[in-house]
């Protein structure tokens, strides 16, 4: 698992939200009530039964909805994020996970205290007003909150620094550059994401993720500005 956590493509698979990866990952996920309701609507054409009542058709229907898709992916992604934070060599990152879990515990206590009800019906109101919309239990409520905070922090860490640079003859430079150098198509292959000038523990990992994100963007969006760039792909059609 630790080796996978260091592979940028592993994180792109999880963070990309692609339908194929979502279907695979959803096998490990626990859908919330709202996710299930997106599939099982008696008055909706999304409802399935009879000859068409298969798990595959239900999953396919659910994953067509962006919000439901995110909820299916969230559970396995949270496990990966927790493992990355917990096993990180940067002690500030491992401490962030501990602090965040403590914060989530405190948040739960606060929101439970704010639920208005008669003392004898407290647990019922907590279930209906708080937990049912977040997976149905205290554990799923906390997992959702933990995921929201970890994914936000992880994304900010990945893009906190700009690793874009120019590498020629083994030498890496962050600029400034002459226009004539950058404007030549033949030099575009020298544009890289490199952490050679950044000494912190996770810089190389973050630089590789930025590089993968850029490659995915260039491959799938066919941006006009780089329509003739070959890099490691052929020119887009």
Swiss-Prot record:
One Pfam family in the UniProt entry: DUF3713
Sequence intervals crossing the membrane: none
Topology relative to the membrane: Lipid-anchor; GPI-anchor
PROSITE patterns recorded: PROKAR_LIPOPROTEIN
Lipid modification (S-diacylglycerol cysteine), residues: 28
Coiled-coil spans in chain: none
Residues making up the signal peptide according to the UniProt record: 1-27
Protein name: Uncharacterized lipoprotein MPN_439
């Amino acid at each position: 698992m630790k080796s996978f956590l260091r592979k940028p493509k592993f994180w792109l698979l999880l963070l990309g939200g692609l339908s194929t990866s979502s279907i695979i990952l959803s096998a490990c996920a626990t859908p919330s009530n709202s996710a299930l309701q997106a599939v099982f609507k008696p008055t909706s054409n999304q409802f399935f039964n009879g000859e068409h009542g298969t798990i595959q058709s239900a999953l396919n229907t659910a994953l067509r909805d962006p919000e439901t898709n995110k909820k299916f992916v969230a559970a396995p992604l949270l496990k990966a994020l927790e493992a990355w934070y917990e096993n990180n060599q940067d002690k500030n990152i491992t401490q962030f996970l501990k602090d965040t879990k403590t914060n989530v515990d405190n948040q739960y206590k606060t929101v439970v205290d704010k639920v208005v009800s008669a003392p004898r019906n407290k647990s019922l109101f907590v279930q209906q007003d708080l937990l049912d919309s977040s997976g149905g239990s205290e554990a799923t409520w906390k997992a959702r909150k933990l995921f929201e905070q970890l994914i936000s922090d992880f994304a900010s860490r990945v893009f906190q620094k700009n690793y874009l640079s120019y590498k020629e003859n083994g030498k890496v430079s962050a600029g400034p550059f002459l226009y004539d150098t950058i404007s030549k198509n033949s030099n575009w292959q020298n544009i890289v994401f490199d952490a050679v000038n950044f000494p912190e523990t996770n810089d190389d990992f973050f630089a590789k993720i930025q590089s993968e994100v850029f490659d995915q963007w260039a491959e799938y969006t066919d941006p006009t500005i780089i329509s003739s760039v070959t890099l490691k792909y052929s020119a887009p059609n």
